[in-house]
């Protein structure tokens, strides 16, 4: 990286200018300048399963880590899929546990798991006696083996191998990531424990799990290694948290629908949360909070294209970000819209409360609520099917909307993240010109929500992307 230069004023009567250079690790000052503290940069790099699927990808991770000396803390997932027909190690471990519950041998599955890690060890030229680790785990398996204890072993083995490959210290996540009895992260205790264990050293720690007060292993939900990376960055006051995956950042649209969508250069924490809420699957839902609390930027990058900057997520407001009127799109499909009408509905909070309670009573999952003049619009989906949806609509009518409830099924919601209201008319025109009617629009800042027929969702998304 080309040296950046910055001038500081020396605290003296002469107010001379002192020039400092940034070398990628920290600020370097002239020898006679002692009035500034040099801060060494720290990057926490988390690598997902797709980046760790085989020995070749392990070696690629080593190149990435070695290319920046600030990457002194590494968090790893279990080995992912090597190709489309392959299985993630975590999926195989879940299957092993299911076999144990029904007292069926999981030996064949275990051999597949063992072969993956032995191949990685051999392909990387490592010496770790991984067979001993695998044998010890298998020997401990019984029908009483805890699910979390078993499925966490993928991350554990990945971290053991990566620590040897990088010549970093292995730090077990169970030794620092603390949960309470209800499974909530104990932030202060976890941060203090990692600070003590890391103590300025280069470390590798497994993602996805920690330890309960009882000593038992506890995992996050799937994708939880993202959370571990964020917690490690927050604990150590990192300058940057990197999340390495197989895509070049957060894409502006679903690549299975839009051909070669561009990555988004910058998102604020709030913008990322908004896109996640409306269906963009980027990070584990709990991964942003620790970084946001510490104001630590998150960089999402691709191990396949490490030269690309990826997407940066940070504390700056959208006004300070690279400007684009239409930034990106996300959405949900398989929704229904219920529209209840009643005079004075918007002035009766108790009726709104009862209306939403009625929908929840029938098992509806609410996606979005908009209250207008004498009208309540709810976007929701019913896990129990159409009959439950219409039963919920009838209960809503009885509870809060005697003037009627209209139900429209088979809808999709397209959410457009925008920076500037002037883009709205252009976006709506593009979708309508593509022959897609918009049944409802609502501003859910910083996104505009547009309800379309589910069968036309992909057409609407392509038209919206072309309107950027």
Each PLM stretch: what is its role?
Residues 2-3, 7-20, 32, 38:
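Acidic, Ala/Val/Gly-enriched low-complexity intrinsically disordered segments
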Residues 22-24, 29-283, 288, 451-456:
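Nucleotide/pyrophosphate-binding catalytic subdomain
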Residues 42-43, 71-74, 168-169, 201-204, ...:
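Structural motif
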Residues 174, 301-305:
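Acidic carboxylate-rich catalytic motifs and surrounding loops in phosphoryl-/glycosyl-chemistry enzymes
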Residues 284, 295-302:
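Acidic/polar loop patches that form or flank catalytic/metal-binding clefts of enzymes
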Residues 309-468:
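A conserved regulatory-domain signal marking ACT and ACT-like small-molecule sensing domains
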């Amino acid at each position: 990286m080309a040296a950046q230069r910055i001038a500081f004023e020396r605290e003296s009567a002469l107010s001379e200018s002192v020039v400092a250079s940034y070398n990628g690790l920290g600020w370097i000052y002239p020898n006679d300048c002692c009035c500034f503290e040099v801060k060494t940069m720290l990057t926490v790099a988390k690598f997902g399963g797709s980046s760790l699927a085989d020995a070749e990808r392990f070696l690629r991770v080593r190149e990435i880590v070695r290319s920046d000396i600030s990457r002194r803390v590494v968090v790893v997932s279990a080995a992912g899929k090597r190709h489309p027909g392959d299985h993630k190690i975590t999926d195989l471990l879940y299957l092993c546990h299911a076999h144990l519950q029904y007292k069926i041998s999981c030996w064949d599955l275990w051999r597949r798991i063992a072969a993956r890690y032995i191949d990685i060890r051999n392909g990387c030229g490592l010496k770790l006696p991984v067979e001993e680790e695998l044998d010890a785990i298998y020997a401990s398996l019984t029908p009483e083996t805890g699910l979390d204890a078993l499925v966490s072993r993928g991350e554990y083995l990945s971290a053991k191998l990566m620590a040897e490959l990088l010549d970093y210290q292995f730090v077990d996540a169970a030794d620092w990531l603390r949960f309470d009895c209800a499974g909530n992260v104990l932030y202060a205790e976890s941060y203090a424990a990692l600070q003590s264990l890391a103590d300025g050293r280069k470390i590798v720690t497994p993602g996805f799990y920690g330890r309960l007060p009882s000593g038992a292993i506890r995992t996050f939900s799937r994708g939880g290694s993202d959370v571990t990376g964020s917690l490690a960055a927050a604990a150590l006051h990192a300058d940057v948290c990197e999340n390495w995956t197989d895509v070049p950042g957060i894409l502006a649209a679903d690549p299975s629908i839009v051909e070669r969508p561009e990555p988004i250069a910058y998102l604020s924490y709030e913008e990322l949360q908004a896109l996640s809420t409306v269906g963009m699957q980027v990070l584990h839902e709990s991964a942003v909070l620790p970084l946001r609390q510490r104001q630590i930027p998150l960089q999402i990058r691709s191990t396949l294209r490490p030269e690309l900057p990826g997407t940066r997520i940070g504390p700056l407001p959208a006004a300070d970000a690279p400007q684009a009127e239409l930034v990106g799109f996300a959405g949900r499909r398989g929704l229904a819209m219920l529209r209840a009408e009643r005079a004075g509905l918007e002035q009766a909070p108790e009726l709104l409360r009862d209306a939403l309670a009625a929908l929840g009573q029938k098992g509806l999952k609410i996606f979005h609520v908009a209250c207008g003049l004498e009208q309540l619009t709810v976007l929701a989906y019913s896990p129990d099917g159409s009959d439950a949806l219409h039963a919920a609509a009838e209960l809503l009518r009885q509870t809060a909307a005697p003037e009627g409830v209209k139900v429209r099924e088979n809808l999709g919601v397209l959410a457009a993240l925008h920076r500037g209201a002037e883009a709205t008319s252009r976006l709506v025109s593009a979708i309508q010109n593509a022959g897609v009617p918009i049944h409802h629009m609502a501003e859910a800042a910083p996104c505009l929500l547009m309800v379309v027929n589910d069968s036309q969702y992909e057409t609407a998304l392509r038209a919206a992307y072309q309107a950027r």
